[in-house]
Amino acid sequence: GGQGAVGGDRGWLLGNGGAGGDGGAGGEGGDSSGGAASAGGDGGAGGAGGAGANGGLLIGHGGAGGGGTGGNGHGRPIGSGGAGGDGGDGGTGGWLYGNGGHGGTGATGGSGRHSGASGDGGDGGDAQAIGDGGAGGSGGLLFGAPGAHG
């Protein structure tokens, strides 16, 4: 899957950063074309979430990071699931005031003969002068470390 887009720009002095886009889903594995002994295709890996944009230079909250998904295996015997994408990092708060953005959640890996590994959560964004750091995104349901707290 493709990488998620970075969050949209904010106003130069004031304004909140946009959230990062979610990573594209990994491709689904193809069905086996031969007999039952032919393995099905594996799912593609999910794309990583985009980073949240930073808050305005003076005042503004950082945007949250996006997440991704993993593709599922198919066929007989079934293929393995693709890895889940990592969560994007949260954006930084404004220089005077603003909270850091939350880190994106890592995606659960796709299902199949072997489940795909889950992605890691993104790091929380930092506050600079006044504001709370963003909490790290959680890891995937099966595997994946949570992101660091801002």
What residue spans do the PLM features occupy?
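Long, compositionally biased tandem-repeat segments
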Residues: G1-G150
